[in-house]
Structures are given as structure tokens and as C-alpha cells.
From Swiss-Prot:
UniProt cross-references to InterPro entries, sorted A to Z: SecB, SecB-like_sf
Protein purpose: One of the proteins required for the normal export of preproteins out of the cell cytoplasm. It is a molecular chaperone that binds to a subset of precursor proteins, maintaining them in a translocation-competent state. It also specifically binds to its receptor SecA.
Principal location listed in the UniProt entry: cytoplasm
Subunit structure, as described in the record: Homotetramer, a dimer of dimers. One homotetramer interacts with 1 SecA dimer.
GO cellular component: cytoplasm
The protein's name: Protein-export protein SecB
Originating species: Rhizobium johnstonii (strain DSM 114642 / LMG 32736 / 3841)
Compartments where located: Cytoplasm
A Gene Ontology molecular function term of the record: unfolded protein binding
Encoding gene, per UniProt annotation: secB
NCBIfam families, per database record: PRK05751.1-3, secB
KW Signal (keyword) present: no
HAMAP family tied to this protein: SecB
Protein family per UniProt: Belongs to the SecB family.
Amino acid sequence: MADDNNSNGAANPTLSILAQYTKDLSFENPGAPRSLQARDKAPTININVNVNANPLSDTDFDVVLSLNAEAKDGDKTVFHAELTYGGVFRVAGFPQEHMLPVLFIECPRMLFPFARQIIADVTRNGGFPPLMIDPIDFTQMFAQRVAEEQARAKVQAVPN
């Protein structure tokens, strides 16, 4: 008896990581060794996150997660960590309308724990407590990105 679960002939969706890599890593501690002394209050930490995806073939994609963490004490930079962490993913069998969510939500979600650990290690190795970045809501990030692109398209479509 034939398997009727796949009657349209499409392959079962698969998502696999073929490779992971650190593309760029930078850590700056401009005030060392003074920045390593005890302080009255914790520095303000700002974290920026970005995700990009580029096709390598019909099924393989390079997904890059960029994390930028900057700690400031007033107007002085305490430390600045930047990481560009990538993964080569094989994405096959998904309907076309699911490709962008897979690339911009699921792939970075798989990369994040590794990137988070690298940032924690580099801040610890820089003389500070490890910076443990809170989990990131990639679904919300993707929704915001789509909304911004739609708003930009509306502005460009309006005649002057």
C-alpha cells in the first residue's frame, strides 16, 4: 500500500545545518585596566541583533546572525563586543510562502545559543562577568521587519 501522506509528490520539509562558523569577532576594552575595577553601578548594556540570509543554491542558504553588545558608563564605553556568526542551512521541501520565516526565524533560532555562548566567553575573557544575552524573539523580529518593508513599499508607491 502506498503512503498517501505525500500525495502531491512534494518532499517532506527538511531543515539541517551543514556548517556553522564565526565570520567576524571583535572585543574592545578601551578603558582597561581601569574599566576592570569595581564600580558603583553596573554599566548600561545595549544589544543590537540583525539577521541576513543569502542563497548558495536552490536548497542551501547562508544565514548570518549579527550581535553587537556595547556596555557604557555614562558616555564612556566600558566594552564593545561584535559577533557575526553564520550557518549554512539546507532547506528543502517547504512551500515557498514558508521559506522566509524558516530562514529568518528558525535558522537564527538554531544559531543563537552558539552565538550567545561566544559573546559570554569573550566578555568573560575580557575581564568582565559573562554577558548572557536574553533569548531573542526571532518571530517578533521577523514580523517587525516585514511591517517595515511593507511601510517602505507604501511610501515608495505614493506619487509625489
